[in-house]
Amino acid sequence: MANGSEVIIMKLIKAIIKPERFEIVKKALEEKGVTSMTTTEVQGRGEQKGITLEYRGKQMIVDMLPKIQIEIIVRDREVDELIATIIGAARTGRIGDGKIFVLPVDAAIRVRTGEMER
């Protein structure tokens, strides 16, 4: 609780985007005041289902494509604005632009101090 009585509702925004859009998305989030985030290199597929590449004259199907996963913990009231920011920076209009998930967060605990936000 903040201020003794206010309950802070937190959410986890998990965005999976094309790697080449990461720096653009990061900059857009920083401009909105987001400085803390976790990123992970992941592989995935959705509607895109993969691509066909040619290597040494042979065709190869790559069905799991590289993506970047961004995780941000935010207050509930910030979710809509940050989703719009991510979409605006990540969207190319082509299949494979990514996906955004929003999940509830029960608590955040700072390891160094043990301080807990609920």
Which positions does each model-derived feature cover?
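Positively charged, small/polar-rich N-terminal and surface patches that mediate targeting and assembly
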Residues: 2-118
